[in-house]
Structure formats: C-alpha cells, structure tokens
Amino acid sequence: MFEYMKGMIVEAQIDKIIVEVNGIGYRINSSINSASQVKIGQVSTLFTHFVLREDEAHLYGFVDKEELAMFKKLISVSKIGPKVAAGILSTYTPQRLGAYIVSNDAQAIAKSPGVGKKTAERMILELKDKIDDSQVEYDQNFFNHENKNNNEVVDALMALGYTKHEGEQAASAVRDTSLSTEEMIRKALNWLAR
C-alpha cells in the first residue's frame, strides 16, 4: 500500500520514528538500527510495510530496502509477527541474520527478544532457501569458528578409522554452529552409522 515515505523526521525513539509528510505526523514502527540512523530535523526516506490486523493497523519502516526485505521474510514465518520481526532486526543487521540462517545458527538467532530456540529453528527451516549470498555477511571470526569445528570433527573421525572423505561428508551433513565440537562428533558418528 505504501512503498515509502519521504518527510521530515520529527522524533526518533528506540522502536519508532515520527515522520511529518505534508503536515501530517506518521508514527512508523521500526528497528533500533533504523531509528538510530535517522536525524531529527532532516528529510529522510523510509521504506515501509503496512500491517493490517483485525483490530489494528501499523506502519513499519526502515532506512534501507534490505532491512525491509528481511522484515517481510521474517513476518512470512509462522508465529513471527511484525513486532518480533522488528525486534530481531534490532538485534542483527539483515546481512548478519542471513548468515546465521544460512549456517543453521539457531542459538545466535534465539538471542533476539521474543525468539526461543524452536522459533529460531522454524525460522531457519522456512527461510534458508529464501536467503541468497548477497544478503549474507560473514566476518573472519565467523569462518574461523566454523572451519575449526569442522576440521576437529573430520580429524576425530579419521582417528576413529574413517576416511577423510567420509569425515568431510559427515561433518558437512551435521554442521550446526550452535553445537560444541563434541556434540557434532556424536551427530557425525550417528550419521555415519545410519
């Protein structure tokens, strides 16, 4: 309904932004990330999504299209409403959240307000195929931690008599950054025994 709003920023709080457009002040619910990027007294553009429920109507807006796109993906997940989605985007950038989804890191996602482990796992299940590499941000520590765990799992499996190829296949099949190396080894052994 509303693609974007361009107007004077009148107020910016933790989770909302007031924008004046043609003499009308619109309250736009947002993430902490977007609210912290706007400047009071300046003209800004917010990319918006209108949420209409039985008893209420809300406008959600973000400073960039990537955050709006991730917001729309999040609210498409069952049991994640717009308020929880905005809270998740207050915790992580869309790119970092995308990295956690792609790497099955339910533990990191569950650190967001209103998100438990089951909701995080459901989010990963429903969104993993909808995230492309341009929407993902990895830093060197992210890769180092993941590779270290994988290498340790492969080494342990080789010490138990499996080939390097078998170890790599099993480690790849059970990769989960929320698990300790020991738990991944156990899961890899179960996977190999199937």
From Swiss-Prot:
The lineage of its organism: Bacteria, Bacillati, Bacillota, Clostridia, Peptostreptococcales. GO terms for molecular function: ATP binding; four-way junction DNA binding; four-way junction helicase activity. It comes from the Bacteria. Belongs to the RuvA family. Residues 146-194 are annotated as: Domain III. This is Holliday junction branch migration complex subunit RuvA. GO terms for biological process: DNA recombination; DNA repair. The RuvA-RuvB-RuvC complex processes Holliday junction (HJ) DNA during genetic recombination and DNA repair, while the RuvA-RuvB complex plays an important role in the rescue of blocked DNA replication forks via replication fork reversal (RFR). RuvA specifically binds to HJ cruciform DNA, conferring on it an open structure. The RuvB hexamer acts as an ATP-dependent pump, pulling dsDNA into and through the RuvAB complex. HJ branch migration allows RuvC to scan DNA until it finds its consensus sequence, where it cleaves and resolves the cruciform DNA. Homotetramer. Forms an RuvA(8)-RuvB(12)-Holliday junction (HJ) complex. HJ DNA is sandwiched between 2 RuvA tetramers; dsDNA enters through RuvA and exits via RuvB. An RuvB hexamer assembles on each DNA strand where it exits the tetramer. Each RuvB hexamer is contacted by two RuvA subunits (via domain III) on 2 adjacent RuvB subunits; this complex drives branch migration. In the full resolvosome a probable DNA-RuvA(4)-RuvB(12)-RuvC(2) complex forms which resolves the HJ. Has three domains with a flexible linker between the domains II and III and assumes an 'L' shape. Domain III is highly mobile and contacts RuvB. Residues 1-63 are annotated as: Domain I. It is found in: Cytoplasm. Keywords: Cytoplasm, DNA damage, DNA recombination, DNA repair, DNA-binding. GO terms for cellular component: cytoplasm; Holliday junction helicase complex; Holliday junction resolvase complex. Its main location: cytoplasm. InterPro entries: DNA_helicase_Holl-junc_RuvA_I, NA-bd_OB-fold, RuvA, RuvA_2-like, RuvA_C, RuvA_C_sf. Residues 64-142 are annotated as: Domain II. Residues 143-146 are annotated as: Flexible linker.
